[in-house]
Amino acid sequence: MKDKFDKIMEQFLIPISDFEGPVMDSTYFMKNDGSFVFSEGYCHPEGAFWGMIIKYPLPGGHIDIFGREYSWTHRVEIDGELCIIPNHQQVENQFKVAPELRAFQGEKPPYARNFIKFPLSDFSGYFDARHSMRELRKEYKWIDEVVRKTCELLEWNPDDTGVTGSLAYGRIEDDVDMMFIGTPEENAAIAQKIRRYVESNPEARVFELGKEWPLRFYYAGTLICPFFRYADSEQIPLLDCDIEILEEGIAMEATVADDTHNLYLPAIVGLTDLRREDGSSEGDMELIIYNGALRGEVWKGDRIRINLTIINLTTPSAGTRRAALITEEDQYTIVEKH
């Protein structure tokens, strides 16, 4: 007999046999054991993807998902406040939950040091962002209203949105992780409208987990957590890339010259006026920010200080060029905000 969990999964989960790829960032997948796994970024191995187990079945676990007990790998409660577990500990937690994955890892590319490689064969299904949004809007009037009002504010078609987070698998929480699916130019325009709205309405600003989140905002009585996705996979800059490390631990200051792709994982920004700590200069280059918490953090005109890795970046469309890579939140600070 099917329980509530099974019935809701029938509504939201799409069989993995229907998955055509490529693996898009911020997509939830369900492992055969019932764990919820979140994909990270766009550059993935053939037949696998980089991601993290977020919630996993655990008898006696403190999270109720439609009548089944779960726990999570990335958060801990300290003195009554939720805190994010450091990245290295999150990675180790993956192997505590699924020790068989350790043998599958192999050598990781530098951008994936905080993620785990999962074979697609380990999954029963995935949660499509658009499909989940349609189901939620049909079933919950308040979600439909929030989506319509938010899209009206941002001058966007609500049918070109999706959801991620727990909403992707039908679990209702207080916030809406709304995904905007457009061209880089369209998504950039939405982000600028959000920034202008927050600047004009300071009460809409969001402070969580010890920081301000520049793209999150309160609207229509709800916390809106925007995510952005490329509508066309051909517009993804690093869908297929190769990275070779040249120098590590290089301290520089630079000015952001191009923020077209700063909304995604990875966030990619063009840098100019680069100065090493010793005073020597560098030519203009791209900075690849491979950390989901840093989406939308830096913008054109910002002067930033970064502790980075110099790499050779190779892509089919642009060949090989020098670039910079960071993967941790503490690897950059904003010296001067534009």
Residue positions per predicted region:
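Catalytic core of pol beta-like nucleotidyltransferases
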Residues: 2-174, 181-338
